[in-house]
Amino acid sequence: MSSTAPEDVARPLLALPAIEAFDAIVRGRRSVRSYADVQVPRRTVRDVLELAARAPSNSNVQPWHTYVLTGRHKRALTDSVLRYYDTIGRTVREFDYQPGPDGWEEPYKERRESFGEGLYGRALGLSLADVDDREFYHRRNYDFFAAPVGLIVTVARNPRLSALIDAGAYIQTILLSARSRGLSTCAQASFLDFHPAVRECLAIPTHRTIVCGISLGYEDAQHPIASNATTREPVDRHVTFLWDDDD
């Protein structure tokens, strides 16, 4: 096997500035939970979602359907979910998308707890005893953290596993497309916990499964919660390399 490649093969597909720009977009994407009171142009939202539809999809079935909410429509969803939250008082999940608080195994349990401590403890200065304040910030999930735009992403119910894989690629493309335009986002599984309220408010048909909500807007970098930051494991912790000896 030749150790050299033709120039047209070895040359990067993207010019270096484009590579640097893409890397900056990926590294700059964060789950933002504080938003400025600044509207996002409709054209920008449409552009983000139009680009997201270029995400890979098994057999090109494109199983996603997204609801875009602003103004009174977003407020109506927030009111509906919080009313359900206050009345039912417990989560009602459509499917078991993740374990309960005590069902996580290591190392995921430790990572999850570290995230919670960073968010509530270091960023907001709250202890486990600050029940009311922690509850206040948890409820902000259902107002999309005051973002001007809220998205609810759904996929076809069948075949659900395939559709959920497609949804992951679609959602990530939304997040990166938004970031490239100076917008911030937060993908939120919390809306799944009260899916009956979401489904009823938006008249989501039964053949669709709710995947997540997404907050979309411009970050309020002055809010204390904006200081929260997460880390990632080094590549050798999550990748097994099986290099060929000739590579």
UniProtKB/Swiss-Prot annotation:
Binds 1 FMN per subunit. Keywords: Flavoprotein, FMN, NADP, Oxidoreductase. It catalyses: 4-nitrobenzoate + 2 NADPH + 2 H(+) = 4-hydroxylaminobenzoate + 2 NADP(+) + H2O. Induction: In the absence of 4-nitrobenzoate, expression is repressed by the transcriptional regulator PnbX. Transcription is induced by 4-nitrobenzoate. Its cofactor is FMN. It holds the Pfam family Nitroreductase. SUPFAM superfamilies: FMN-dependent nitroreductase-like (SSF55469). NADP(+) binds at S59, R112, Y120, L126. The keyword Membrane does not apply. FMN binds at R29, R30, S31, V32, R33, R232. Its EC number is 1.7.1.-. The keyword DNA-binding does not apply. One of its GO terms (molecular function) is oxidoreductase activity. Optimum pH is 7.5. Coiled coil: none annotated. Optimum temperature is 35 degrees Celsius. Belongs to the nitroreductase family. Nitroreductase involved in the degradation of nitroaromatic compounds. Catalyzes the conversion of 4-nitrobenzoate to 4-hydroxylaminobenzoate. This is 4-nitrobenzoate reductase. The lineage of its organism: Bacteria, Bacillati, Actinomycetota, Actinomycetes, Propionibacteriales.
